[in-house]
Amino acid sequence: MFNVVIVRYGEIGTKSRQTRRWFENILMNNIREALVSEGIDFKKVEAKHGRVLVRTNRAREATEVLTRVFGIVSLSPAMEVDAELEKINKTALKLFRKKKRELNLEKPKFRVTARRITKEFPLKSPEIQAKVGEYILENEESEVNLHEYDIEVGVELMEGKAYIFVDKIRAWGGLPIGTQGKVVALLSGGIDSPVAAFLMMKRGVEVIPVHIYMGEKTLEKVRKIWNQLKKYHYGGKAELIVVKPQNREEMLKKIKELGKEKYTCVLCKFMMVKHADRIAKEFGAKGIVMGDSLGQVASQTLENMYIVSQASDLPIYRPLIGLDKEEIVDIAKKIGTFELSTLPEDEIPFIPKHPVIRGSWEEFRKIYMAIFGEEPRKRDC
């Protein structure tokens, strides 16, 4: 029934004409990539008057996939017809009846919303709304209600065509991936780090996922998490990078001998950031993403995050810093990573009973020198 998907974007529309065209082109490329990767045939993807039109006979399936493409605010599977009142009326009635059956309503309340994006059509928007609404009332048991409606019939007109729809499906918004550069995201296998990576993707950033190896069970879990996140990563090309640290056992043995086991978590995170820093520079990434939420665990106090941040001179982004655990879990459930994050994983045998809560850089520096025989790096800014 539907032959086109109307794609609406948000922030892109606030850009200058030249910048907007660049964003639109990246968005359209990401749309094409998403459809091809999901095996959905389409005839054309084009930008017109602040909209992107996806011409496909599988509009419902395409809409479901495209809700996961960042930069899109909402979508509508629609029927494109010539901008003639009779054709508009008949198509609107057809879609109204279909929606009425789906909702299983005998006398639905409805309204018609029309917009002339270009002005060739002789009737003004309120007149179109009145004509289409009148036609539906004459031919179908229904009631007009502009505020408390069951069905909204949308009509958009541009360049001699009318696009009629009855659904407006919300997407994630944000910016198209590929418009804001690259970052390395540390993925531990927990609930938080996938959400942090997701939120950076949402802002148009290509993510390079890095996992610091803890065991096969955890690695398998992280692979599943990344495969789920890739469903939102259209426009990004990176695959999971696994780092197997050398001499970790020796490092942990030495910190125990020093009687400074309370710094174990801070030291391990410091070393993780060092690995991420190396990979980020290798790939030309402009920062490192971590799933820290302020005060959630001992290693995520301001003092301890300050120490960990010294391991790289790149910016360290913590998009969850102001979120409660419940808010993070809610996002994880929506994006499909929560259940995966709660799968069994390898036990971590070296977590101290009493981890340091407010670590000191000077004390950490002495521990680091005693273990590695050199000064830890300290960021320049």
From Swiss-Prot:
Under the heading Pfam families, the entry gives: ThiI (PF02568), ThiI_fer (PF22025), THUMP (PF02926)
State the species of origin: Thermococcus kodakarensis (strain ATCC BAA-918 / JCM 12380 / KOD1)
Q: Where is the THUMP domain?
A: 60-168
As for family, the record states: Belongs to the ThiI family.
Q: Where does ATP bind?
A: 186-187, 269, 291, 300
Q: What class of enzyme is it?
A: transferase
**CC annotations in GO:** cytosol
- Keyword flag Lyase: no
The entry's protein name is Probable tRNA sulfurtransferase
Asked if the keyword Ribonucleoprotein belongs to this entry, the reply reads: no
Lineage, uppermost ranks: Archaea, Methanobacteriati, Methanobacteriota, Thermococci, Thermococcales
Enzyme Commission number: 2.8.1.4
- Indicate the principal place this protein occupies in or around the cell: cytoplasm
Q: What Gene3D superfamilies is this protein classified in?
A: HUPs (3.40.50.620), THUMP domain-like (3.30.70.1510), THUMP superfamily (3.30.2300.10)
